[in-house]
Regions:
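Extreme N-terminal starter segment of soluble prokaryotic enzymes
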Residues: 1-5
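Short beta-strand scaffold segments in enzyme catalytic cores
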Residues: 81-83, 106-110, 144-146, 225-227, ...
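CN hydrolase (nitrilase-like) catalytic-core segments centered on the catalytic cysteine
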Residues: 63-78, 162-243
Length: 268
């Protein structure tokens, strides 16, 4: 599977512009042969635009998802619609299974190239340190996976990277690739270099850590989106500017590495 990480530029609370950039990145990635394109955390509004969360919240299948789904179908490519701020009440009214019937969640949706929804993941670990996320949002409860391009794919979001037990649970359910939409800021750039790589090494799987690019009143995003292979080797990486990076991620590589170095079999 050819995985593209779309490190799009994000403007605070400018939904239409941000989604247009995302659609453009999907088109570019598909033209370069991508099978799956991953977008960053809250790419449509900006993670640090906390004052806009309620105003720009959408149900699953709302405006942002409709536009991203249409791009996936048009360009024949699977798309992880990063995350958006989900209006749980509106989703519940539309018949979606939700962790609460009111409030907001930080929600990722994976569409396949036919536009079918394959996975919905709501961020489990909400960030409270110098962030309003933990005050504003409802955490998710489920750890879904989906079959895509020969991989068993899961999604975790940004701060989830600091909780390795989450990834071990995913390995136990057969996961071979984890996509990590993020809004990682300075000054914790060294943590961003370390944590996705550590999760790949520990669990002998692919990690696609996709960050945004842009500046907010309280933080600047570090960019540096990277695909790590099951040895933890960076096989595609960016700097901090808006760009798309792509890597071939053959599922058989996971099998090869786990057979060559069967550390997962030695757990006690």
């Amino acid at each position: 599977m050819n995985l593209a990480l779309a490190q799009v530029g994000i403007e605070p609370a400018k939904r239409d512009r941000n989604v247009r950039r995302a659609v453009g990145a999907i088109e570019s990635a598909a033209a370069e042969g991508a099978d799956c394109v991953a977008l960053p955390e809250i790419f449509n509004a900006g993670y640090f635009a906390f004052d806009a969360y309620e105003r720009l919240a959408e149900p699953i299948g709302g405006e942002t998802h409709r536009r991203i789904r249409a791009a996936a179908v048009e360009h024949d490519v699977a798309v992880l619609a990063g995350t958006v701020v989900e209006d749980l009440a509106a989703s519940a009214a539309a018949g979606e299974s939700v962790p609460a019937t009111a409030g907001l969640s930080n929600t990722a949706v994976l569409f396949d190239s036919d536009g079918d929804r394959r996975l919905v993941y709501r961020k489990r670990h909400l960030f409270g340190y110098d962030s309003a996320e933990a005050e504003l949002l409802v955490p998710g409860e489920r750890l879904p996976t989906a079959e895509l391009g020969g991989h068993t794919v899961a999604v975790t979001t940004c701060y989830d990277l600091r909780f390795p037990e989450l990834y071990r649970r995913l390995v136990e359910s057969g996961t071979t690739m984890v996509l990590v939409p993020s809004a990682w800021p300075y000054p914790r750039v060294e943590h961003w270099r370390l944590l996705p790589r550590a999760r790949a090494v520990e669990n002998l799987l692919y990690v696609g850590a996709v960050n945004g690019s842009g500046s907010f009143e309280t933080a600047d995003l570090v960019g540096r989106s990277t695909v790590y292979d099951p040895w933890g080797t960076p096989v595609a990486a960016s700097d901090e500017g808006a760009t798309v990076v792509q890597a071939n991620c053959p599922p058989e590589r996971v099998t090869e590495v786990r057979e060559e170095f069967p550390a997962l079999d030695d757990r006690r």
